[in-house]
Design a protein with these regions (language model features):
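Short, flexible loop/turn elements at secondary-structure junctions
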Residues: 20-25, 63, 71-73, 96, ...
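A solvent-exposed, charged loop/short amphipathic helix patch at secondary-structure junctions
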Residues: 29-48, 342-352, 356, 395-397
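Non-transmembrane alpha-helical segments in soluble domains
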Residues: 56-61, 122, 191-195, 220, ...
Length: 522
């Protein structure tokens, strides 16, 4: 009864942190008692061997606003009766949508335990000022013929191909039919149940492109009656073409038909790190030219902007968001290699210091973008997965977050923490309004490839800083930039960030060091 949603003034203020329950706490270095359980996030005062905060205290220290929990409903791939055996899965294989998974509870045999412990976790996060996002996978189920849906009304809840086969837009054996009245009703009621019963504050829709636009908008409308601040976003794609007309699908290209629902920008992600299909091929971050426009597309939040020429953007040849808060800005997530592994794969000869510098540069793009920033748990301390590309069922040894990394890469952690603090303190970085972004975010002319620079001008969005210049350089050498003449305070340089200032620069030229970002203001 005393559980309150932490305040959220605008979707532009959202900062997402994506985590898996086991990854977060299973390592001995977490210092957490309830390892791999919902209760792990209720433990305060937990520390690593070097006495640095872990778990929920780490999240508070980092400053994120929302924890995005990988699937936490009851999924099929982990056998709750055999928890003494090593089992791991992300959980994208739904069995029962409306109850927490027992493997994350302290006693899967007592039905009330998982429910109570999940609620304790939500309550603890809320008390810590953090909202909770549930990853929902209504697009397919683990079983088809033996599923609850098929047993209820055979042939109704799943789409079929013309020749009567199960359609497979999910790549997992089936795809549900959200366009049918009772599947739509099921999804809406399930979402409302998680909100009312478990106080969930947001939803991330797996393969949202399989669902239809009308269902997504009806979910948004139903949520708005309870609390419009509950955040909705999803993957604006499918694994293969769903059995429904393209103009009805909740794909990225149709986001403009879904107000206040956001989608991930793979344009920005792959413009920074390279495509998902070849881990050894890098992009902007490793100094490959030609990705600048895809990144500018991400910086403005996938909206129309006079300086973003959409023809040169990868994947999308036109802006797809009406508002910047409809775009999720990110460089890595649970899928594919995590950022540290990807950088290593694309730059095998780079030193640890060089890789750390690029990790910082990548996160600077994410947290200075007008989209909604998203970070994969552990990227703030160069977490790795030993090079595994798809770790959905890899053992803990691959997936766990080693909290000793927080000591080894303290500078990366402090830098990301600094970026988040700057974003929260300065509304210019989160305008949340497309017209304002077009008016007050201007890209500066650059002579080189692999350099992107922009100015947030005239106290953008009521900011106390009059003009803010963000310059991002992935070249192996420093670059000279022409800037509006004046005296500026340096906030970020050489992989350090300090809002009180790191010194002054004046004149109409700026030297931006190699493989790093520079942020100055007046």
């Amino acid at each position: 009864a005393d559980d309150k949603r932490p305040a959220l003034a605008s979707p532009a203020d959202v900062i997402l942190y994506e985590m898996h329950h086991r990854d977060m706490s299973i390592d001995p270095s977490s210092g957490i008692e309830h390892k791999g359980k919902f209760l792990a996030l209720t433990e305060q005062g937990t520390v690593s061997p070097d006495k640095l905060a872990t778990g929920i205290d780490h999240l508070k220290e980092l400053g994120i606003t929302h924890v995005h929990l990988l699937p936490s409903y009851d999924y099929a791939s982990v056998d709750e009766t055999k928890l003494d055996k090593a089992q791991y899965n992300w959980g994208y294989d739904p069995q029962n949508y409306n109850v927490p998974d027992g493997s994350y509870s302290t006693d899967p045999y007592k039905p009330d335990v998982r429910i109570r412990e999940f609620k304790q976790m939500v309550q603890a996060l809320h008390k810590a000022g953090i909202r909770v996002v549930l990853d929902v996978v209504y697009n397919h189920t683990f079983n088809t013929d033996e599923s609850n849906f098929e047993r209820t009304v055979p042939g109704y809840f799943y789409r079929q191909t013309k020749d009567g086969q199960w359609a497979n837009g999910s790549g997992c054996g089936n795809e549900t039919a959200s366009d049918r009245a009772m599947m739509r009703k099921y999804m809406i009621e399930s979402i409302l149940y998680w909100i009312n019963e478990y106080h969930i504050d947001g939803f991330r829709f797996d393969l949202m492109g399989i669902h239809d636009i009308e269902t997504m908008n009806e979910i948004r409308a139903a949520i708005d009656k309870i609390d419009p601040s509950i955040f909705m976003y999803g993957e604006g794609w499918a694994a293969s073409s769903p059995q429904l007309e393209a103009d009805r699908l909740a794909m990225k290209a149709n986001v403009e038909k879904m107000p206040r629902i956001a989608a991930f920008s793979d344009e920005m992600r792959d413009g920074l790190r390279g495509g998902w299909d070849d881990d050894t091929k890098g992009a902007f971050l490793v100094g490959e030219p030609g990705h600048e426009m895809s990144i500018k597309f991400g910086i403005v939040g996938a909206i129309e902007h006079p300086q973003v020429i959409s023809d040169s953007v990868n994947y999308s040849k036109k802006p797809w968001a009406l508002q910047p808060t409809q775009m999720i800005s990110y460089v890595s997530c649970h899928d594919d290699m995590c950022l540290a592994d990807r950088l290593k794969a694309t730059m095998p000869d780079a030193s640890v210091e060089e890789l750390a510098a690029l990790q910082k540069l990548a996160e600077t793009f994410v947290f200075t973008s007008q989209g909604v920033p998203f970070i994969f748990a552990g990227d703030e301390m160069m977490r790795d997965k030993k090079g595994v590309h798809n770790s959905y069922n890899s053992p803990d040894s691959i997936n766990t977050i080693d909290w000793k990394n927080k000591t080894a890469h303290k500078d990366v952690f402090e830098y990301v923490k600094g970026l988040i603090a700057m974003r929260k303190a300065h509304p210019a970085f989160r305008m949340g309004d497309a017209d304002m972004v077009r008016r007050q975010l201007e890209f500066l002319p650059v002579e080189n490839t692999n350099v992107v620079a922009f100015i947030l001008k005239d106290n953008a969005n009521g900011d106390s800083w009059k003009n803010i210049i963000v310059a991002l350089n992935s070249r192996a050498e420093p670059v000279k930039l022409d800037i509006p003449s004046g005296k500026y305070t340096v906030i970020c340089k050489d992989g350090k960030i300090n809002m009180k200032g790191l010194g002054q620069v004046s004149g109409d030229e700026l030297m931006v060091p190699a493989r790093s970002a520079m942020i100055i203001h007046q």
